[in-house]
């Protein structure tokens, strides 16, 4: 009986405090909103952010391969979805040479000139081993590149390297602000013409 009495007493003492607690919570919420906060929990929003940032690697590969097929304007249009307007993009080649451009239009022209100059008729960029670290509206991302550049039916150039990206969230969208490609290999693979053809079973 004494225990129940103490419980009732504790509850009765707590009830008058509820208005004060409610006011405190309301004040905290108002301050949070005024400071530009959202009600998304960090644990819930980070996976979404990482997924959106990872999609930027796909965006870039699709844009580059559009240029590889000869459609330079389509590639540039795709690039605009991947990068900020003032993005800086750098390629560092295995021999130590490098090229840096600002803006997707300039970078698209550079990519097109490299592809045309080497006689590529198609390209395929595969991206993997993606690592992302998000901090507020900024993020860093690294990813591995394996790219095939087709010269002819018997000759391809293969590039391998690492992309290092600085990513920023602008107007609710993640975009790459700075990208550096560090190539470790750029090799030509060729084979003599062959009469062997891929065998495809008939139905």
What do these predicted ranges mean?
Residues 75-144:
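A solvent-exposed, acidic/Ser-Thr-rich amphipathic alpha-helical stretch
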Residues 62, 66-69, 92-93, 117, ...:
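General structural signal for alpha-helix termini and helix-helix connectors
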Residues 23-37:
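Bacterial N-terminal signal peptides
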Residues 17-23:
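Short, hydrophobic alpha-helical membrane anchors of single-pass surface/secreted proteins
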Residues 1-17:
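N-terminal secretory signal peptides that target proteins for export/translocation
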Residues 38-85:
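Short, low-complexity N-terminal intrinsically disordered segments enriched in polar/charged residues
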Residues 45, 116-203:
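A beta-strand edge to alpha-helix "cap/lid" segment located at domain peripheries
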Residues 62, 85, 89, 169, ...:
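Active-site micro-motifs of SAM-dependent methyltransferase domains
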């Amino acid at each position: 009986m004494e225990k129940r009495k103490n419980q009732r007493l504790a509850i009765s003492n707590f009830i008058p405090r509820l208005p004060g607690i409610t006011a405190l919570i309301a004040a905290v919420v108002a301050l949070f909103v005024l400071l530009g906060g959202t009600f998304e929990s960090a644990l819930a929003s980070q996976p979404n952010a990482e997924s959106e940032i990872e999609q930027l690697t796909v965006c870039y590969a699709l844009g580059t391969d559009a240029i590889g097929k000869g459609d330079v304007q389509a590639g540039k249009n795709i690039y605009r979805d991947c990068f900020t307007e003032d993005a800086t993009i750098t390629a560092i080649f295995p021999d130590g040479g490098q090229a840096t451009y600002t803006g997707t239009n300039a970078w698209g022209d550079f990519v097109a000139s490299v592809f045309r100059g080497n006689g590529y008729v198609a390209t395929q960029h595969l991206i993997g081993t993606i690592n992302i670290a998000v901090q507020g509206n900024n993020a860093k991302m690294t990813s591995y590149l394996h790219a095939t550049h087709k010269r002819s039916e018997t000759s391809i150039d293969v590039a391998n390297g690492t992309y290092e990206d600085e990513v920023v969230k602008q107007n609710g969208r993640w975009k790459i602000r700075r990208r550096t490609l560090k190539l470790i290999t750029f090799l030509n693979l060729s084979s003599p013409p062959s009469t062997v053809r891929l065998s495809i079973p008939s139905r």
